Amino acid sequence: MVMPMEAILLPMYIEMSQLDWVNSLPALVVPSIAKCFSIYMFYNFFKDIPDDLLEAASIDGSSPIRTFFSIVMPISKTVYATVFILDFVAHWNDFMWPFLVMTGKDKRTIQLAVQSFFGTQPVHYSAIMASLVLSAIPMIVMFVFMQKYYVEGIASSGIKG
């Protein structure tokens, strides 16, 4: 959260190469599982859940795992949706990390494929613009359907601004 991604690219790449994950899907997915901002949003949401609610479940005989899945998860779907949207948009638009770890042309992300248009002679601006529009469609569709959760999640996570 405090350290920019560019500062940790080299150590992360060395880690991925030691695990022999370069040019594989885990190299894209695993580094993004526990991002600091996502943990911060979950922490702010979960600390505001009333203790009375959890105590009532405990008094009713609910185990901690059942309390989590029956009470905490349903009331926290807005923060889950918000984290999903923010992480999806960040990873969908990410260029530098996939550029480092995905070496094969068959496993390129959409941003790497768009960048490959710039290396051709002559530059086909119509193809570039069409690919950029196509790359934006999934984010627009997702935001239209999840806008309610996004706004509620930002409001309930404690981010002021």
Indicate residue ranges for each PLM-predicted region.
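A hydrophobic, multi-pass inner-membrane permease signature
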Residues: M1-G161
